[in-house]
Design a protein with these regions (language model features):
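Catalytic-domain carbohydrate-binding cleft regions of carbohydrate-active enzymes
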Residues: 1-175
């Protein structure tokens, strides 16, 4: 993904980085080769795409668009879908006789064909646990039938024993 200065640099957790452009054959092939070499070849059978919401907000940011430049403002949902499909396809090519399991945080329309998603980085609280259950049911009604959450929360203090037990029990019932 580029802007007028070259690759679009965005703030990630530990520094600046750039997103791959999955509308470009070379970027997609690079991703799949890395997935094969660094994950599948060492025996890990699950693909997990994280931090793939493509939060690129520069007005001049564009992607390759399969040969016709496309403003990123119109491709925010497309990129995570294509990333997830590339992950799914590489897993399927690696073990064609086995069922593919992929999880992805970016949750665009069409995702259910390739992966499950989860609610993202949630907080350790009773409120969040209740909210996540509502979110899972709503996502399921919207066609994302396989969803999940960070049990016990991702951010905040460690859950006490009761909260962790209740959260685990609740997530056993998530669609």
């Amino acid at each position: 993904v580029r802007d007028h200065n070259g690759p679009c640099l965005e703030q990630f957790w530990d520094g600046w980085g750039a997103h791959l452009d999955f509308t470009r054959d070379g970027d997609r092939a690079w991703w799949q080769a890395g997935l094969q070499r660094q994950v599948l070849d060492i025996g890990i059978d699950v693909g997990w795409n994280d931090n793939n919401e493509y939060e690129i907000w520069g007005e001049r940011a564009t992607c390759h668009g399969f040969g016709q430049a496309l403003p990123m403002a119109r491709a925010h949902a497309l990129q995570p879908l294509l990333m997830t499909r590339a992950t799914f396809d590489q897993q399927a090519n690696n073990k064609p006789d086995e069922r593919v399991y992929t999880i992805t945080r970016g949750g665009p329309p069409g995702l259910q064909r390739y992966a499950q998603t989860w609610s993202g980085d949630n907080s350790t609280s009773w409120h969040t646990m209740r909210w996540n259950q509502r979110m899972a049911l709503t996502m399921s009604l919207s066609g994302l039938f396989n969803t999940g959450h960070d049990i016990g929360g991702f951010d905040g203090p460690a859950p006490d024993a009761e909260m962790l037990i209740r959260w685990t029990q609740a997530c056993c019932l998530v669609p």
